[in-house]
Amino acid sequence: LVGSEMCIRDSENFIGCDSSYRAASIVLYGAPYDSTTSYRPGARFGPAAIRHESYGLETYSPYQNADLTDFDIFDSGDLELCFGSSESALADIEARAEEILQDGKFPLLLGGEHLVTLGAVRAAVKKYPDLHIVHFDAHADLRDDYLGAKLSHACVLRRCHELVGDGRIHQFCIRSGDRAEFEFAAQHTEMHKFD
């Protein structure tokens, strides 16, 4: 067995992800984490729920004339993340993305709260220093800190900006945030507000 095929799958696979790790060009993995959620916890159940609900979809898109089964995708299951430490969870997410990238494959992450993005971006920017981020959300997530924490779902794009720099975060459908977030976005990101 290839090392990554030894992952224990504690949930069903996403529909159409039938490839082996060795043959895959895309590796899907889950980051069930929601320790900094401030409104309603439960995002940690997201990866399993997304996989479960994927079986209500079809693999073929007539709009794209493409089928998920046209791609070699391996679902490696969910990471076991430490809920007591955001930095530890981010390090695990980053390490998994780094392993996938080093194997010449594309990592595809299912979250979890928004903070999980930072771990994957940390890995991706090492391989792709000119990385751009496309962010669809109702909230800007550009606070410098939230409730005294710099590692929070409300700060994740601010931390990503520290890695990728100005003009490389493209935000769409943003409808709320505090004044400082919108002022920061005007200077540092490409924000397209919700209309």
Spans of features found by a protein language model:
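Conserved alpha-helical scaffold segments that buttress catalytic/binding sites
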Residues: 9-195
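Short, small-residue-biased leader/transition segments that mark boundaries at the very start
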Residues: 1-7
